[in-house]
Structures are given as structure tokens and as C-alpha cells.
Amino acid sequence: MSDGITGALRNAASVVAPDAIRRRFGAKFAVAFIVVLVVIAGAGVFAFQSTETTVEHQTTRQLAESNQLEADAIGAWMEQQRTHARSVSQDEALRDDRRAAPYILLKDQLLPADVVSMHLVNETRGTVVASTELAIEGRSLAELDAPWTTAAVPEGPGNDSAVWATEQSYRSPVLNDEPVMAFASSVPKREGAHLVVVTRIQPQVDRLSDANSTRRTTILNTGDEPVLDSNSRFDAGALTDSIAAVRNDTTAATTTVSNGRVYALSATPHTDWVTVTSVDTGEAFAVRDTVGQTVTVLVVLAVISLAIVGIALGRHTVTPLKRLRNRAQDIESGTFDVDLSTRRIDEVGRLYGSFDDMRVSLQDRIQEAEAAVEEANAAKAEAEELRTDAEDAQAEAERAKATAEAASERLQERAADYSEVMQAVADGDLTERLDEDADEEAMRAVATEFNAMLDGLEATIAQVAGFADEVADETLQVATGAEEIETTSQTVSERIQEIADGAIQQHDDLERAAGEMDELSASIQEVAASSATVAETAADAVERGEAGRDAAESAIDDMAEIESLSADAVDQILALQERMSDIGDIIEFITDIAEQTNMLALNANIEAARADKDGDGFAVVANEVKDLAEETKQAAADIESEIQAVQAETDETVADIRATSEHIDDGVSTVERAAAAIEDTVDAIEDANHGIQEISDATEDQADATQSVVRRVDDVADISQHVTEDAEQVSAAAEEQSASVAEIARSADDLRDRADALATTVNQFETRADADEPDADTTVDASADDTGD
């Protein structure tokens, strides 16, 4: 299978590659180098684009998830504040103005620290009936500058659970102009009354901003205005379509890039608000830029490394072989005056030296042959004198000439064979070898050195191929390990997510437990307050009993004085009765005057009628006098009736005083018995007071203990919240790690592909190891080459 593929690729390369490239090893090396460069650059561009897309997707997804978490947190906070307002407003204490003030003061201590103040508003009267802020209590709503003074709070059947909230935060003078929000809930069974709960939102504002980052979160109301910070400004013009899409589908979330920032939008639960989270693109895609730089550096390093290898191989192998091939062709054509000197001492240098020795040896043999021919000619001339000797000398000269010519032909044939072998080696066939079985020592040295150089070159190529295979194997192991790490990271992420879900459930349970503990604490504190009230009442009863005892003792003394005073009162009332008779006479006199005045007014009217128009003014005065007389007469009648009533009551009073005087003696004895009974009652109340004081102290201790439990439950709930947030952060980190491991795996795959490409390039050289291993992958005569000096 491998041989078939290799053969097919070789045939395809032979068809595609022109003969000019196939005949030159340097050209093939240059083409191979360019192909590898293109492959590496393409892989780098693909890796960068793939990584860029993945990182951008992960960044926007993480921003959207963070935006959704913040929206859920704001929605939960709003629902919690509505629950506070709704639960506090349902109590019966708010239906009585006298009980409302201590009730909201107590609730203010029990609710979380974010609650700034509470106000009971009577819309009918337009006043604040009770408030935790004494400066506001009793004031008119028109005098206050706060949004809740004009709140349209739903009330009536079916609206007891409805809670009104401000559309935007406002600055509270109570908190030094810190941002707050108000929540209002109607009081059941009390028309025109609702409770206002004012809550600080600075912790929410601080949580949504990070001074060390460009990331910002803004909550927009229905008018696209910031809710939590009314002083801030937000340009929602570029996000109009996205905001409308979120409002139309509250379950949808969207992301967009605009004005150099990445935006994530989602609906805020339990409200009609939109949560917008944004971050600068430079910060959001910093990882993408870093990965791009890393990929670029890897590609550049790979290109530089390949260039160094190509230059080294080309400069130290291809170029010397080309020069040596040209010198061998000169020698083959009969030009022996060629320069074969070199400063290299490796196999190539020794090969140059062997060729130079061969050139010198061949030149010496030719010179010897020419000298032999000259000697033969001289001998032939001398042989003319001695024919026999000359014939022998001539024969010997001819034999010497034949020997020299044969040696010259053998040298030329050997040089031609060596040239063919070197040409094959230059074409990439490293399995060829020079025949070392030569008669001439110089030729044997040339063959030996050249073959040694080819052995070294074969070893180098084999090492490079082995290194490429090892790199491929190692990258395969790295990719496998990266996949295992990615699987483990995903498992860890799932486990951490399960832990986060459990922590959220635990946090919810703790919040419910905290609410129940709050109610229990409130009940115990009410019992403690009632116990304290009873204790104070008992103590007051003791004091009043003691005062009653003292009063009873003094009452006995006062009875005698009352008895004497009652006699004096009878005398004074009798004198008063005589004065009343005198007043009656005066009233009769006033009545007579009024009747006479009335008669005068009547006469004046008669005269005015006679005077016609000239008497209009006189008639008016007469009418006024008449009216005054009538009023005087009526007043005199009223006074007379009152005097008669007073006289009747005076008579009754005289009778009562006399009867009272008779009962005073009986009262003295009764008061004495009551004083004794009060003494006994005071003692019993003192004993009861001691017991009630002990109960009050025990109840206060229980209330303090319950408050401590509530605080601890709140602390545990806060810890649970932190655990949940940390678990979510760890889960996000695990997902990022999984993504990074996936990138490592992809990079390892790219490296393995490049190693395979290098192995393919190296396998273009035919070596004896390939010939000895028929089952191994054979080389491919690809059109890939590298150049260098």
C-alpha cells in the first residue's frame, strides 16, 4: 500500500515537475523549501484564524454568561427588597399610629444593613405618620423632596402583594447623597396607607464596577436611563435594536460590538429592566492578540529553522557537488588545468583532494605515455641502423604505446563512470557508489573518499528522517495527552459546576433559614418587649400601690376637713341663691328696657315710612335698633332660664352636700379598711414584680441568643454566597483551561503535520537503508528543493 502510494506520488511529481528541475538537485531542494514554507505559513494562518474565531466566541460567551449572572443578582436583590417591604407592611401594628412607630423601629434593627429607613405614609392626610427618621415623622409629603412622596402604590383587594419601586435611584440626604432606591407596599385593611422602605444601592454599584478593568455593567429602565446611578450617562443609541430584541424576548440574550466595545445584553428578572455589560475590545480580545503573536512567532521560528537547515545542506552539499561535477566534466574533456583546491577537511574536502590526486596522476600517465612515444620514435630512428634491434625496439615501443593508450582509455572510462555516479548523487540518489576496485591508486582514493562522504550524508539524512519521525510520534503523544487533559478538565469543570449548583441551593436554604430566624427573633424580641412592659407595669403598680396607701392615710385626715368645708359650702350656696334672686330682678329690668327699645324702633319705622325716600337712612338705623332690642330681649330670656336652672341645681347641690356630710363618717372607716387592703396588695405586687423581672431578664437573654444565631446564619449565608461565586469562577477557569488544552492539541497536530512534511522532504533522498527495508515507506521524488550558499 505504502509502495503504491509512493510510486503514484513519484510518477505525479515526474509529470508535474519539468526536466530542468528534475535534472538539478539544487532546483528540487529550492522547490521543496518553498513548498514547506507555503505549508507552514498556511498552517500558521489557519491556526491563527481558527484560534481568533474560537477566542472571540469564548470571550463573547463568557461576557454573556457574566452579564446573565449580574442580571440575575440584580433581579434577586430587587425581589428581596420587595419581599422586605411586603412582609413588613403586612403586620397589624401598622394599622394603629401609636403602635406603628415602635414597630418600624424594631423592624429597622432586624432587617439587613442595606435598609436605610422606613416611613409609614397616610395618603389621605398627606403626611408621614411614623418614620425611623425623626426629622421626617409628622411632616407633610409636599414638604419632602423624594420620589416616594408621589408614589402610586396599588391597594385594595388583590393588591396586598404588589410593591411599587422607583424607576431610578436618587440621592438621599440621610446618606450624604449616596444613591438609594425606595420600595412601597400598601397596608392591608387601612385605606390610603402604605409603608416605604428606602434601601442603599452603593454595594450594588460597587459590585458592578471594577477600577482595574474597563468592564462596566449598567442597568437600564424602560426609558433607557441608568437605574443604579442616576448621575451617570449611557448612550444607548447604538444598542437600540439589541435592547428592543431583549425587551421583546426576555429569555434571549445578545452580544454586539460597537464603538470599540463588546456589549452583552439580557433581561433583568422580576423587572422590566435590561442589564448591559461592556468591555473594551482591546481587553476582551487580549488573549486573541497574544495567541496571534504566539502563532506568528512559531511560524517565523519554523521558517528560520528550515532556512538554516536548507542553507546548511545546500551550502555544504549541493554547491560543492555542483562545482566538483563541473571540474570532473573539464577533466573528462581533457582539460587538466582545473582548480580543485578547498579549505574543507570533511568528506567533501577529501573528495576534492582525491579528484585532484586523480587529475595529477592522470596527467602524469599521459605525460609518461607521450614520453614513451617520443622514445619509441627515437629508437625507431636508431633502429634504421640496426634493423633487427630497431624492429625489436619498435615492437617494444609499440607495446609501450599500446599500454599507455590502454591506461589512458581506462582512466577516461573510469572518469566517465565516476561522473555518471556523481550526477546520480547530485540528482538525489544516495545509493550510488564509486567503484573502489581501480588499478590506479589515485582513482581508488577518489572512490574511497567519495563513498565515505556519501555514507556520512546518508547518515545525516537518516538522522533527520528519524528526528522527523520522533517529532511526529512525540507530537502524537502530546496531542493524546492534551486530549486526556481536556477530558479531565471538562470533568473537573462539570464537578465544579455541580459544586456551584449545590452551593447555590445551600445558599437558598440558608437564606430561608435566615428569614425564619428573623421572624423567630422578632417574635422573641416582641415577647421581651412585652415582658419588659409588664415588668414596668408591675413596678408602676407597686409605686402606685404605695402612693395609694399614702393617699388613703391622708384621705382619712382630709375627710374631717371635707366635713367642715361642706358646712361652709352649704352656707355659701345659700348666699349664692340669694344673689341669684337679685340677678333675676336685674334681668327683668333688662327685659323691660328691651321691650321699650323695641317700641322705639317700631315708632322709628313708622316715621321712616312717612318720610318716604328721605327717611331711608333713618329706617336702617331703626331696623338695627329693633334687631338689637330683639337680641337683648332674647339674651335676657336665655340668662333668666339659665339662672333658673342654676337655682334648681343649687338646691340639689345643697341637698347633696348635706347627704355627703352624712356619708363622710362612713367613708372614713371605709378608707381605713381600704388602706389596710392596699398594704396587702402592695406586698403581693412587689412579689409578682420580682418574678416578672426575672422572666423579662430571661426573655432578653433569649432574644440576644436568637439575634446571635441570626447573625451566624447570615454569616454562613454570606460564606455560602462567596463559595458559590468562587465555584463559578473556578468552573469558568476550568473551561478556559479546557479550551487552552484544546488549542495545545491543535498546535500539536499542526506540529505533527509539519514534521510529516519534513519527513516527506527528507525521504526524497534515496539511501541504501531504503533499499534494505522493502516494507518501509520509500522516498518520493517530490518537486521540493532548497537553495543556499
From Swiss-Prot:
GO molecular function: transmembrane signaling receptor activity
SMART domains: HAMP (SM00304), MA (SM00283)
Cellular location(s): Cell membrane
Keyword check for Transmembrane: yes
SUPFAM superfamilies: HAMP domain-like, Methyl-accepting chemotaxis protein (MCP) signaling domain
Job of this protein: Potentially involved in chemo- or phototactic signal transduction.
Name of the molecule in the record: Transducer protein Htr6
Species annotation: Halobacterium salinarum (strain ATCC 29341 / DSM 671 / R1)
Native organism taxonomy: Archaea, Methanobacteriati, Methanobacteriota, Stenosarchaea group, Halobacteria
